[in-house]
């Protein structure tokens, strides 16, 4: 086992490598550098972004379902009637619009 670890931890001398292996190692180093630069350049959303848009869509759905299931539209807000559907769909649409900004 120690011999395997020693072989894995050994570094290759570039003078002993074939030109093909040297080119392959150089390409790999360039690819690694390019990927690391790309990752550094990406922007990400705050941690609260995904739970917020999921919550908005779920609350909007629950709002619409409660309006449909309540007798004579007396819930969630009794005095506005069918505008309860507008509120529910607005919450859902805000959640969907937020998904477009998700990275």
Swiss-Prot record:
GO terms for biological process: cell division. The chain crosses the membrane at residues 49-69, 80-100. The keyword RNA-binding does not apply. It is a multi-pass membrane protein. Keywords: Cell cycle, Cell division, Cell membrane, Membrane, Transmembrane, Transmembrane helix. One of its GO terms (cellular component) is plasma membrane. It is found in: Cell membrane. It holds the Pfam family CrgA. Belongs to the CrgA family. NCBIfam families: PRK02251.1-2. Involved in cell division. This is Cell division protein CrgA. The lineage of its organism: Bacteria, Bacillati, Actinomycetota, Actinomycetes, Bifidobacteriales.
